[in-house]
């Protein structure tokens, strides 16, 4: 196809000097970088992005109501955004995941990790033969039909289920959607396998796409610290860490969550793996309140797993989130026996590893304890981070020895 035969897209013109991030292949254009839009573009429609002199930079999706005015589909001027484009992106992602699944014996993994797989705003998780789709940006929603067609080409034997029922869609003027797209409806609880564990996943009603695949490697690492130990599993959700701790030979694991439904599934997961249910306790409570109550009653643990939900959605919330992370980690440190292990995580993208480490250090000072950092964690390998988009590294964690 010659350049003259390409579709003529509306042009997003950047202000002078605001093209530097695109020249470094960062996939976002913020509102402050925009000079004007030449031509008419509907929400999510494909546009060309040019500098102030009209030089072509990238091709992306238009979102006039978002702070991120455009998300880049491609830096290749010869690529049209069509079914063939999405098929190529899926094949690229599929190659890595197929190798990883074979190497690690996985039946469930993240197939598409948004910007890091060249598909901004697109999240796809595979659970067995179900593909769970989340479209988080206007461009992704606009290309829904093309993306689904490409998925059917690459994964003809898989059913597709939509979980685009996340609040972030409202920021770009989109309604929340959920339901079957192709194939049969997922069962109420779908069994998957992870590092020797059998785990039940609620695709239709669970958090995100049903399960936190990004913590797969951290759950496995937990086993090295828990033998004959008393473990506190905070924000336990459906008990992945609890099952792993029991498989690692812990003396007891106490799982805490505010959701009774999640705790019920956690209990079923322990039973499904034929583990000793008498070693597992399930507590429905607010973690902050319970930790304070434990402190008042002199409760002690040997290992504490701290895997809270995202505390910060935007920069204005960062300071408050820092206080929350500091408070909860201080409480955990106070509850640990000397030589105890704190496995603590943050899934907030705006929280850098350096800042998170400083927060833990400050929490240790407030707790009056010395802490050694002994291991660092990140999201599993099916959640890659492309070099030009460091924001893709959202999950970070530390193993800390509390003196």
Curated annotation (Swiss-Prot):
E.C. code: 2.1.1.191
SUPFAM superfamilies, sorted: PUA domain-like (SSF88697), S-adenosyl-L-methionine-dependent methyltransferases (SSF53335)
GO CC terms in record: cytoplasm
Principal place of residence: cytoplasm
Cysteine pairings via disulfide bonds: none
Gene Ontology MF: a single term: rRNA (cytosine) methyltransferase activity
Catalytic reaction annotation: cytidine(1962) in 23S rRNA + S-adenosyl-L-methionine = 5-methylcytidine(1962) in 23S rRNA + S-adenosyl-L-homocysteine + H(+)
Pfam families documented for this protein: Methyltrans_SAM, PUA_3
Domain of life: Bacteria
Compartments where located: Cytoplasm
Residue ranges of every copy of the PUA domain listed in the record: 9-88
KW RNA-binding (keyword) present: yes
The keyword Transmembrane helix is assigned to this record: no
Its biological purpose: Specifically methylates the cytosine at position 1962 (m5C1962) of 23S rRNA.
NCBIfam families in UniProt: PRK15128.1
Family of this protein: Belongs to the methyltransferase superfamily. RlmI family.
Protein name: Ribosomal RNA large subunit methyltransferase I
């Amino acid at each position: 196809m010659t350049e003259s035969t390409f579709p003529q897209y509306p042009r997003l013109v950047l202000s002078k000097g605001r093209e530097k991030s695109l020249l470094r292949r960062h996939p976002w254009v913020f509102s402050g970088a925009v000079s004007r839009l030449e031509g008419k573009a509907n929400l999510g429609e494909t546009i060309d992005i040019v500098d102030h002199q009209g030089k072509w930079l990238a091709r992306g999706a238009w979102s006039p109501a978002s702070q991120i005015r455009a998300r880049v589909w491609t830096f290749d001027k010869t690529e049209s955004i069509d079914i063939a484009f999405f098929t190529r992106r899926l094949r690229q992602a599929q190659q890595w995941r197929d190798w990883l699944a074979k190497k690690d014996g996985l039946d469930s993994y993240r197939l598409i990790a948004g910007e890091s797989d060249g598909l901004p705003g697109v999240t796809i998780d595979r659970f067995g033969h179900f593909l769970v789709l989340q479209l988080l940006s206007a461009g992704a929603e606009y290309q829904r039909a093309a993306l689904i067609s490409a998925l059917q080409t690459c994964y003809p034997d898989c059913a597709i289920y939509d979980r685009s029922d996340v609040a972030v869609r409202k920021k770009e003027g989109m309604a929340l959607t959920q339901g079957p797209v192709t194939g049969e409806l997922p069962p109420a609880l779908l069994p998957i396998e992870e590092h020797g564990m059998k785990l039940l996943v609620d695709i239709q009603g669970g958090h995100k796409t049903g399960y936190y695949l990004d913590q797969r490697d951290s759950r496995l690492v937990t086993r090295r610290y828990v033998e004959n130990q008393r473990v506190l599993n905070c924000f336990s959700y459906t008990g992945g860490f609890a099952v792993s701790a029991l498989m690692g030979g812990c003396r007891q694991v106490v799982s805490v969550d505010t959701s009774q439904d999640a705790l019920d599934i956690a209990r079923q997961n322990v039973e499904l793996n034929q583990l000793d249910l008498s070693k597992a306790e399930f507590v429905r409570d607010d973690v902050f309140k319970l930790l304070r109550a434990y402190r008042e009653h002199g409760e002690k643990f040997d290992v504490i797993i701290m895997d809270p939900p995202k505390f910060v959605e935007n920069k204005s919330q960062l300071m408050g989130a820092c206080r929350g992370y500091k408070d909860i980690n201080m409480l955990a440190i106070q509850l640990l026996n000397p030589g105890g292990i704190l496995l603590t995580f943050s899934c907030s993208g705006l929280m850098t590893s350096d800042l998170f480490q400083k927060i833990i250090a400050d929490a240790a000072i407030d707790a009056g304890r010395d802490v050694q950092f002994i291991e660092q964690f990140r999201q599993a390998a099916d959640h890659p981070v492309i070099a030009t988009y460091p924001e893709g590294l959202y999950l970070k964690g530390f193993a800390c020895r509390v003196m």
